[in-house]
């Protein structure tokens, strides 16, 4: 009887051994899969560099989470000093022993020949065609593989948690026949390329939107049908400070995220981190704005976000909150204006350089509300916001598509690297 994927999964979950499988210490595996020590499959490769002071050398680095190799700026041998470095050999498994527990692994190629790597980046070449490097990298990104890297990296977090190479090579790994390894690796590599192409498309859409923002929100480019004068308005003329406290016991605690805006804190951090007493928090309604005065990536002078996800929520009293005056400005336009960073130069002008309290910019409320904002007519604001919102929707759909492709890859890894689904050779 030929079993389907669901039948195999159900049998394995019940502890039964399906036809064509066997029970091992590593779990239930296909009958032709074996368990090997890594030392039986890999051999260390090293060729020391005789560093010459006047020569230029390009060093590699290894990103965490299986993101692979990157190149550093060339340096002279004199700048390397007494560092112990090695020539990069092609077609090897390479690992950063300091961050192996974070899956800082990769595969060397012909592109890296002539470059050098730290003594902390040991390289290994397959022995007797027992293991495919691409398969091995995918394996180390699974739960079973990361467990091996962590177990071989004892100690505390950070630089004290270093991979013990002897322990690493004594670790046991599950391997299908080499041809099946290569086929599995090819399938996963194809899926990686799908993700990579869509991520490039997303980056291009984001660049296009940024260009549109810079053109439309400054009046450099006008939409058809609009030619009216733009005027500078102070924030206090179009919005009022919002300080309503949470007297109703609302528990939807919000935080500001660069990508998601005002989002539920527990959802964003996967845990509740706010204090128990939330009565002094500000109570926001949909459409209200909040300004986080702390620096974050991409927001050197803090981020201003609009509440769009929920009807109501609460934020820390450290935020500056405000509500637009009805009929004075488009909330959607203002949201795009702040996202473009066009308020930053205003904040920079009155924020004291280096004056931060617990990471927060020292900003006076009056100064903040005296900030100037360039505004066209309400009709043109609405039209601009519609164009930029349409671009946002395209970007969000692409993000969702990419996330689905990543989930698809996870499912493929779970099925292919455990032998639940077999590939045809």
State where each predicted segment sits.
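Non-catalytic DNA-recognition/assembly elements of restriction-modification systems
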Residues: 19-49, 170, 178, 223-246
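Residue-level recognition of short, solvent-exposed, well-ordered loop/turn junctions
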Residues: 34, 71, 77, 83, ...
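A short glycine-rich beta-alpha junction/loop motif
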Residues: 18-22, 101, 115-120, 155-179, ...
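A short beta-sheet element
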Residues: 84-145, 164, 282-343, 356-357, ...
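DNA target-recognition patches
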Residues: 18, 39-43, 47-81, 123, ...
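Amphipathic alpha-helical coiled-coil/heptad-repeat segments
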Residues: 1-28, 32, 175-231, 374-425
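Short, solvent-exposed loop/turn positions at domain surfaces
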Residues: 23, 79-82, 157, 190, ...
């Amino acid at each position: 009887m030929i079993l389907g994927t669901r039948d195999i999964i159900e049998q394995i979950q019940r502890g039964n051994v399906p036809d064509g499988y066997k029970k091992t210490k590593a779990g239930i595996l296909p009958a032709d899969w074996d368990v090997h020590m890594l030392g039986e499959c890999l051999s260390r490769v090293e060729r020391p560099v005789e560093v010459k002071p006047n020569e230029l050398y390009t060093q590699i680095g290894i990103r965490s989470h299986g993101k692979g190799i990157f190149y550093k700026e060339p340096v002279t041998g004199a700048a390397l000093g007494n560092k112990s470095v090695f020539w990069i050999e092609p077609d090897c498994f390479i690992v950063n022993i300091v961050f192996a527990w974070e899956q800082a692994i990769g595969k060397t190629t012909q592109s890296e020949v002539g470059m050098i790597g730290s003594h902390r980046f040991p390289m290994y070449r397959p022995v007797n065609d027992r293991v495919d490097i691409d398969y091995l990298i995918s394996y180390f990104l699974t739960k079973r593989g990361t467990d091996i890297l962590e177990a071989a990296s004892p100690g505390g977090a950070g630089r004290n948690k270093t991979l013990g190479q002897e322990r690493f090579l004594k670790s046991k790994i599950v391997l299908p026949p080499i041809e099946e390894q290569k086929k599995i690796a090819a399938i996963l590599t194809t899926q990686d390329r799908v993700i990579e192409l869509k991520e490039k498309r997303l980056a291009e859409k984001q660049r296009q939107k940024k260009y549109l923002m810079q053109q439309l929100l400054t009046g450099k480019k006008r939409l058809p049908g609009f030619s009216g004068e733009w005027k500078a308005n102070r924030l206090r003329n179009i919005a009022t400070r919002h300080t309503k406290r949470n007297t109703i016991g609302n528990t939807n605690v919000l935080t500001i995220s660069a990508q998601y805006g005002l989002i539920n804190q527990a959802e964003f951090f996967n845990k509740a981190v706010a204090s128990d007493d939330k009565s002094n928090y500000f109570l926001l309604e949909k459409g209200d704005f909040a300004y986080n005065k702390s620096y974050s990536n991409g927001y050197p002078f803090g981020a201003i976000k609009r509440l769009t996800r929920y009807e109501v929520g609460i934020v820390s009293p450290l935020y500056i909150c405000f509500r637009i005056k009805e009929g004075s400005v488009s909330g959607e336009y203002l949201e795009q204006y702040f996202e473009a960073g066009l308020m930053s130069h205003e904040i920079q002008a009155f924020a004291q350089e280096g004056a931060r309290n617990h990471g927060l910019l020292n900003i006076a409320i009056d100064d903040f509300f005296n900030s100037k904002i360039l505004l066209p007519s309400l009709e043109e604001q609405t039209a601009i916001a519609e164009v930029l919102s349409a671009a946002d929707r395209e970007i969000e759909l692409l993000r969702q598509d990419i996330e689905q492709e990543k989930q698809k890859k996870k499912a493929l890894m779970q099925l292919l690297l455990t032998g639940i689904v077999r590939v045809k050779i």
